[in-house]
Design a protein with these regions (language model features):
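Anion-binding (especially nucleotide phosphate/pyrophosphate-binding) glycine-rich loop
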Residues: 1-131, 135, 139, 143-145
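C-terminal substrate-binding/cap subdomain adjacent to the FAD-binding core in PCMH-type
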Residues: 137-159
């Protein structure tokens, strides 16, 4: 975990807007997230992925949490199917390129969509007739109020 005080957010948003945050924490693991959860009860905060869907119009007087949780794993299910696990801090476009390099096809229409994997289920990203929901089996998430790991299967995601 990295912590910065009174930091510029210019490099953390794709508009390149100069704004400052009182504090910014980069999290790299679920342990990092668990450590800061108690602060979220009483402090103003926002989570930030790739910074492509945010426009700062003024300084942010609070805690900015930047998701840097990375990891990719591919597990064969059978001869024709593969189960891919990707952590939420992975860059979406880099993930699509990785799947293609592994010989897993289907996501290529969604290449060059900015942001991180963590935003994909929230927005059901899509392009050229292909949507995230077409390939998502489940989403694992942390309930911020309790720190409990929750798993949402495809129907529970309500795409």
């Amino acid at each position: 975990m990295n912590t910065f005080k009174n930091i510029s957010l210019k490099s953390f948003n794709t508009f390149g807007v100069e704004a400052r945050a009182t504090e910014l924490i980069e999290i790299f693991s679920l342990d990092d997230l668990t450590q800061i959860l108690p602060r979220l009860v009483s402090e103003k905060y926002m989570f930030l992925g790739g910074g492509s869907n945010v426009l700062f119009i003024k300084d942010f007087d609070g805690l900015v949490i930047v998701n840097r949780m990375k990891g990719l794993c591919a597990d064969p299910i059978n001869e024709n199917d593969i189960h891919v696990t990707a952590l939420s801090g992975e860059n979406w476009h880099d993930f699509v390129i990785w799947t293609l390099g592994m010989g897993f096809y289907g996501l290529e229409n969604m290449s060059l969509i900015p942001g991180t994997i963590g935003a994909a289920p929230m927005q059901n990203i899509g392009a050229y007739g292909v949507e995230f929901k077409d390939y998502c089996l489940k989403v694992d998430a942390i309930e911020l109020a309790t720190g409990e790991l929750k798993s949402f299967d495809h129907p529970a995601c309500q795409f």
